[in-house]
Design a protein with these regions (language model features):
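Catalytic core of pol beta-like nucleotidyltransferases
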Residues: 1-160, 168-348
Length: 348
């Protein structure tokens, strides 16, 4: 299992969005973002060993999946509080795994390589490889920039699991997005969610993101980084390489100020397809709350906020306003941390 990299012998490849890590206790975390402190990886617990769990690893260990962010934090607070820490750069409590507590690193690119050379794939793994081949060919990119993440990466998928892919590189991500746009219009290999599928997705998402059903349907049916391939749900993350991100851990400091609700016009959506995603704002009008500096952008580390608005849209945003401190201080709004957080085009 080459995709399982022993922490003591791992390469110098950066551990970023799309990777999973397993702790000494057997907890499995999914890595968040591209900025991490030198002594730990910012990651959120996803699978926990449980004798009654409905997922079984290749090593025969039963696991249970934790879904909502609130449930993940409650579990760690009760059982493993040392995986919650205060981060001085992000100015808040985060989940994170110290390097010394990591047993394995699950590498999405290595996992794909393993699947591509395997002669004994299950139906879901086979469909995942076929989707990779289709996307890579249509986008004209190397398969070496694509990885398998999610439950397939850690070997805890079931027959009904979805296909989670990650594409690394800004240029590669844009090429994949354009290819998916063409493929989605053709509706031959992939198709968008239908109404029934979107309603099921709404029930799942509403566990920790609350927006009206009719609004949800209007927004989600336009998205192409998610959909159906050969009867299976897919979800594709586009992730910039660390050197393309334009920021290293500690370059800026983020100070949460409080909640804010605002109306603004989206002036730039170039980063709206990536994870983390970002929307540049113009003509910001604060409806409630306070920001000590001009609010320039809205950011999210959650995939569900990608493709949420288009350039020129007037949007309603509610989330945590943060003071971004570097050479030029400004404010941004972070969405996705709390169920009340929203980023909704006013026209829908």
């Amino acid at each position: 299992m080459d995709y399982l990299v022993d922490i003591l012998h791992r390469s110098k490849k950066p551990i970023i969005e799309g990777f999973f890590i397993e702790t000494l206790e057997g907890l499995i975390f999914d890595v968040k973002g591209l900025l991490h402190p030198p002594d730990r990886i910012i990651a959120y617990v996803r699978y926990i060993p449980n004798t009654k769990g409905d997922r079984v690893s290749r090593r025969g260990i039963r696991y249970r999946k934790i879904y909502s962010l609130l449930d993940r934090e409650k579990f760690l607070e009760k059982k493993y509080p040392y995986y919650i820490y205060y981060d001085p750069i992000f100015g808040r409590r985060l989940q994170g795994v110290p390097l010394g507590s990591i047993r394995y690193i699950y590498d999405p690119i290595e996992r794909l390589k393993e699947l591509m050379y395997s002669e004994s794939l299950d139906p879901l793994e086979k469909a995942a490889v076929e989707l990779v081949e289709e996307v890579a060919e249509r986008a004209g990119i190397s398969r070496s920039t694509i990885g398998i993440t999610g439950s397939i990466l850690v070997g805890l998928h079931s027959s009904t699991s979805d296909i989670d892919l990650v594409v690394y590189g800004e240029k590669e991500g844009i090429s994949v997005y354009r290819a998916l746009l063409d493929m989605s219009k053709e509706r031959v290999k992939i198709r968008p969610y239908n109404e029934e599928e979107l309603e099921r997705l709404f029930i799942f998402r509403s566990r920790d993101t609350f927006i009206p059903l009719d609004t949800f349907l209007k927004i989600e049916r336009k998205k192409i980084l998610q959909g159906i391939f050969k009867g299976r749900e897919y979800f594709i993350r586009l992730v910039k390489r660390p050197e393309e991100f334009g920021e290293k851990y500690g370059d800026r400091r983020y100070k949460p100020i409080g909640r804010v609700r605002l109306r603004a016009i989206v002036s730039d959506t170039r980063d709206s397809i990536f994870t983390p995603c970002r929307y540049i704002l113009d003509k910001v009008k604060v409806i409630s709350g306070h920001a000590p500096k001009p609010i320039k952008e809205v950011v999210s580390y959650r995939g569900r906020f990608r493709e949420q608005a288009r350039k020129g849209d007037t949007v309603i945003v509610e989330g945590v306003v943060e003071l971004v401190e570097n050479e030029e201080s400004y404010c941004r709004v972070l969405v996705g941390e709390y169920p009340r957080d929203i980023l909704i085009p006013e026209e829908v």
